[in-house]
Each structure stands twice: as structure tokens, then as C-alpha cells.
Amino acid sequence: MLSYWRQYLAISPFYLIFTVFSFGPVFYSLYLAFQRYDGLGAKQFVGLQQFEFLWNDPVFWLSIRNTLLIWVLSTVPTLFGALVLATLLHSVRRFKGFYRIALYVPNVTSIVAVAIFFGAVFSNNFGLVNAILGTVGISPVPWLSNPWLIKVVIAALMTWMWTGYNMIIYLAGLQAIPTSIYEAAKMDGAGPVRTFFQITIPVMRPIILFTVVISTINGLQSFSEPQVLFASNAANQNMGGPGQAGLTTLLYFYQSAFLLNDYGYGAAIVWAFFVLIIVLVVINWRIVQRGRKS
């Protein structure tokens, strides 16, 4: 290995720059979490005071509840829908490439454009959904003013964007399963439903675990969705809508750090949220691993 020191020396500037610009801000944010800093004046060390205030901050816990509920409402249908679509697409013989691209397009579409589209579709007064409901005699639904429906709309937006991404991953896993396994199951009299739950799901467990972890991380990082969704209302743009029903933790971090210039408190928010994400990822991992062993 030492014989290649010249080669390592040649590529070392890239890794040094990468380390500085990647891990430097991470450690600096941890440093800020123990400081009171408004971005202009001198920093003041306050120890764990930021985290103590965070623990007693009702808005922080509201943002945590909103984030977790949106995560559940989006992750479950996303993964289930992706697995169903991948299974159906796996059995398609014609136009498979077209369907694959069409279902994946939402994931590469600008999240701002998608949020604006959903805001127009679910608008309380002029939305497409309420217009359709009106044709069958149903009164307009307050999609963007009801606390629960706000979360449903944000979850639907995230589901629409990420289902295709997970579907591609599941489809790759399905294509790697030998056809001989399905042929043997068919000879034993197993129907499609039994084959799906007793063969496809067990074989796909490692891939499902991967998508659960990735979806957990992505689902908990919702920020642009509620911000852009309420961008037309200046009073609610960075508050998560009426009653802060769509205020996610990252949106609260943005509000605290960049709108109120409380960078120390903003850093404390993201580090507390980082710990929460790690805990949830570990719990998901344990649950899936336990199911795999059983």
C-alpha cells in the first residue's frame, strides 16, 4: 500500500477539500448548538441551555408530531404502492420501458413544481379536486385549512414523488429472483397471492429493509413541501399553514435559524432531530431484522 503513496498524494487534495466542506459544517453546527449567536455579534457559550429550552418548547414538539404523522401517512402507502406497481410491471411484456419511465418521472420533477401543482389541485376555492366533488353534489373540502387534511395533502405529495423511485428498486429485485422458484411454486399449486407473500416478500426482505430506511430518512426531512404549498399566503409560508398544522421540524429549524437569526437554537433543533432519525432508523432495522429471522 505504501508503494502507491504518490497516487494517494495526487488525489489527496480532493479528499481534503471534500472533508472540509462536508464535515466542517457538521461539526460547526454542533459547536453552534452550545452557543447563542445571531450571525452578527459575538458568540456566547450557553452549554445545554438551548437543549433545555428545546425540551420545553411546545412548537418544537408540535413540529415533531407533524413530521412523524406525515412520515407515517406517506411512507406506508409509498412502499406498499411501489411493491404492487413493481409486481404488476414485472409481469408486463409490452411497453415495460414506457411504464417504467412514466412512473419514475415524478421523482425527477422539481419539488417546487410538484408542490405548486398540488396546491392548485387541492385549493380550497378553485382546486380541481373540489371542482370534481362539486359535480357530484359534494361540498368543497377545506384541504389546505383543516389541520388533518393539510397533513394528508403533504403526505399525498410525497407519496406521488417517491413511489416511482422505490418501484424501480423493487423491480430490480424482482428481476433478480430466479424464475425456477416461481415455476416450482406453481407446480406445487401455489396461487398468485400465496406466491407473493410466501416467496416474493421473503426473498425481497433485504431490499425492503433498504427502502424502509431510505424512506424513513426522506420522509422525516420534509421541508420544501409545506413551505411551497403555502407560499401563496405570506403569513403561513414558513409556519406550515393554518394552526401550524404542516410545520415540520426542518421548517421550524429554517424559521428559527434563518428568519429569526437564532443560529444556535436552529443548530440544537437539527441535532435533536438527527438523534430522532437515528433512533427511528434503528427501530425500523430491528423490526425488519426480527421479522427476517422469524
Where are these regions (language model features)?
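A structural signal for multi-pass alpha-helical bundles of membrane permease subunits
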Residues: S3-S294
